[in-house]
């Protein structure tokens, strides 16, 4: 790439989806399987993966991706998979299946032991990257609805790799003093692009606050700012909205995002559509929150639907001008404690494509009224 070449619109980002086979529509976008396969096929030096857990062998397509990684590692490509210390259940089986892949467990909050690694992203050769809500599991690759972004624009991939370096510094096998020193070395150079300096209309946001480095944007600050500044429309497709934070088994009210949605509907007359998931992984407060929003804003332009098939898509669109794709729920525990990276864009084409996905999901036969 020429050093003074113009930045491509949208930083060469393409939307990526996993759609279960039992859905009544198909995607026009790259599939998660195709995305991961391309990253592996084109890799020459390294592939770095961050995911809460690692269970690719649970589906046929997931197993195919893991076999491709195994082949790449046997050819000398450096492969590191970061996973949370509490998500390592399948680690022994995977290590025996492929000893050349380096699996590293991390604990991003050894002091309080409440934070998890939620980030779902891949980076290869400082040239290609994926970020979204597909963890490195067979379900995310094949049977659970997910949404992410793939880019082969090197500056963006390099910026995401900085996040990998940050999470890697919290290797749970190291002692706390080494963790702190390592983190201190990588955090000051943790980002090049942010809300005030996007590249091609694209930037990343980060969580939690104690992992922020120089010029990073806190994800919750950006999300709430966008919700508070919404003028015409807010479209949300999420597994759950939970206005609480859980610590040591106790729940504490965390209304920041919840209140911002209500204020937009009641105070400013913003049209809001909320599509929530409804499956066994939902927080107990999730459906109660959806019903409370529906009831409280009954005199306003706020609609709530429930998606009946396993849906881990986490998407926010504001005023048809901004899109946010993340791996975290709008959940106080996630935003206060967990480590993740979100994708943000004001590029018109990317926002338009994300909007079409939301519209498709909203009118599909899988979306049911909350009142039914």
From Swiss-Prot:
It is a lipid-anchor. Keywords: Host endoplasmic reticulum, Host Golgi apparatus, Host membrane, Host-virus interaction, Hydrolase, Late protein, Lipoprotein, Membrane, Palmitate, Viral budding, Viral budding via the host ESCRT complexes, Viral envelope protein, Viral release from host cell, Virion. It is found in: Virion membrane; Host Golgi apparatus, Host trans-Golgi network; Host endoplasmic reticulum membrane. It catalyses: a 1,2-diacyl-sn-glycero-3-phosphocholine + H2O = a 1,2-diacyl-sn-glycero-3-phosphate + choline + H(+). GO terms for molecular function: phospholipase D activity. A lipid is attached at residues 185-186 (S-palmitoyl cysteine). Induction: Expressed in the intermediate phase of the viral replicative cycle. One of its GO terms (biological process) is viral budding via host ESCRT complex. Belongs to the orthopoxvirus OPG057 family. Interacts with protein OPG190. Late-budding domains (L domains) are short sequence motifs essential for viral particle budding. They recruit proteins of the host ESCRT machinery (Endosomal Sorting Complex Required for Transport) or ESCRT-associated proteins. F13 contains one L domain: a YPPL motif, which might interact with PDCD6IP/AIP1. Major envelope protein that plays a role in the biogenesis of the viral double membrane and in egress of virus from the host cell. Produces the wrapped form of virus that is required for cell-to-cell spread. Acts as a lipase with broad specificity including phospholipase C, phospholipase A, and triacylglycerol lipase activities. This is Envelope phospholipase OPG057.
């Amino acid at each position: 790439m020429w050093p003074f070449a113009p930045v491509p619109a949208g930083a060469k980002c393409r939307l990526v989806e996993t759609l279960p086979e039992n859905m009544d529509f198909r995607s026009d976008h790259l599939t998660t399987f195709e995305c991961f396969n391309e990253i592996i096929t084109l890799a020459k030096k390294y592939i770095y993966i961050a995911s809460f857990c690692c269970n690719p062998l649970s589906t046929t397509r997931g197993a195919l991706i893991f076999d491709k990684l195994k082949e790449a590692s046997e050819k000398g490509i450096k492969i590191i998979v970061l996973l949370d210390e509490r998500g390592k259940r399948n680690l022994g089986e995977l290590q025996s299946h492929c000893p050349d892949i380096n699996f590293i467990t991390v604990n991003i909050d050894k002091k309080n032991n409440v934070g998890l690694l939620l980030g779902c992203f891949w980076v290869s050769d400082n040239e290609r990257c994926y970020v979204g809500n597909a963890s490195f599991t067979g379900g995310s690759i094949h049977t659970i609805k997910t949404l992410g972004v793939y880019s082969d624009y090197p500056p963006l991939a390099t910026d995401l790799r900085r996040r990998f370096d940050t999470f890697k510094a919290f290797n749970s096998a190291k002692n706390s003093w080494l963790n702190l020193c390592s983190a201190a070395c990588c955090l000051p150079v943790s980002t090049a692009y942010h809300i005030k300096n996007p590249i091609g209309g694209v930037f990343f946001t980060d969580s939690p606050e104690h992992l922020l480095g120089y010029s990073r944007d806190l994800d919750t600050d950006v999300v709430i700012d966008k919700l508070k500044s919404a003028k015409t429309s807010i479209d949300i497709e999420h597994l759950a909205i939970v206005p609480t934070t859980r610590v040591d088994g106790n729940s504490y009210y965390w209304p920041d995002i919840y209140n911002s949605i209500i204020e937009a509907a009641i105070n400013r007359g913003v049209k809001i559509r909320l599509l929530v998931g409804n499956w066994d992984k939902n927080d107990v407060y999730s459906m109660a929150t959806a019903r409370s929003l529906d009831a409280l804003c009954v005199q306003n332009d706020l609609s709530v639907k429930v998606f009946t098939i396993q849906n881990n898509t986490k998407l926010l669109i504001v005023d048809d001008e901004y899109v946010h794709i993340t791996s975290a729920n709008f959940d106080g525990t996630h935003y206060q404690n967990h480590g993740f990276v979100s994708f943000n864009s004001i590029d018109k084409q990317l926002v338009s494509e994300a909007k079409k996905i939301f519209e498709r999901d909203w009118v599909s036969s899988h979306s049911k009224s909350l009142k039914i």
